[in-house]
C-alpha cells in the first residue's frame, strides 16, 4: 500500500483514541462456526443492536439451522423483522449459505474445519455460496482463532475517508494492511471498537465518565 508508513501511524493513533473513548469490548468466541456465519450474514448490513435482535428472533423461531435452511425466504425475512435492513436479501443469503454447507458436507455443520489448518479453513469458507469476505473474516476471528479484522462497507468507507488507508485500496489490501498493524491478540478489540465508532448510535458504548463530587470543608465545632 502506498504511503503505508503514514497510514500505519494514523491507524495506531486511531486505535489509541478508540481505547480511550470506548469501554473495552468483551471478546466474542463461538463454539459453533455455523452460528458465527449466520450472525455475520445478518451483521454485515445491520447495526450491532439490530443484529442481536434479529439473531435472537431467528434462534427463538427456528428449531435449528437445518430448519432455517429448509424454510421459505419470505418466512425468514418476516422473522428477521422490518427493523432489519435488507431482510429479504439476508434471508436469501442465509438459505443459500446453509444449503451450500449441506451440499459440501451432507450435514448442516462446519465443525470439520477445526480439524484442518486455518489457511485451508479460510479457503473452504470462501467457497460457501453467498458468503462475503466480511463473513469469512468474522468466522475466522470469532470461531477459529484466526488473525482477521472483518470490514463492513461502512468501516471501509470510514477508513478511507479518515485517511487511514489508501483511497484506492481494495478490501483484501486493507485487510492485509490492518493485520500487519494490529497483532492477533488485539484483532477482536480493534474490530469491535472500529465497528462501535461507526455505529449511528454509539452512546451506550462510550466510557462512562465519573462525576466527581466537589469536596466539602468540614466546619469546626464551636
What are these regions (language model features)?
Residues 1-35, 92, 133-222:
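C-terminal accessory module of base-excision DNA glycosylases/AP lyases that mediates lesion recognition
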Residues 11-15, 55-129:
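Alpha-helical ds-nucleic-acid-binding substructure associated with the helix-hairpin-helix region
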Residues 18, 33-39, 43, 52-55, ...:
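Functional cleft and adjacent loop/helix regions within the main domain
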Residues 34-35, 51, 72-76, 106, ...:
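N-terminal alpha-helical segment
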Residues 39-53, 82-89:
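A short secondary-structure junction motif
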Residues 41, 45-50, 63, 102, ...:
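Short alpha-helix boundary/capping elements
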Residues 43-47, 60, 82, 102, ...:
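Amphipathic alpha-helical interaction elements
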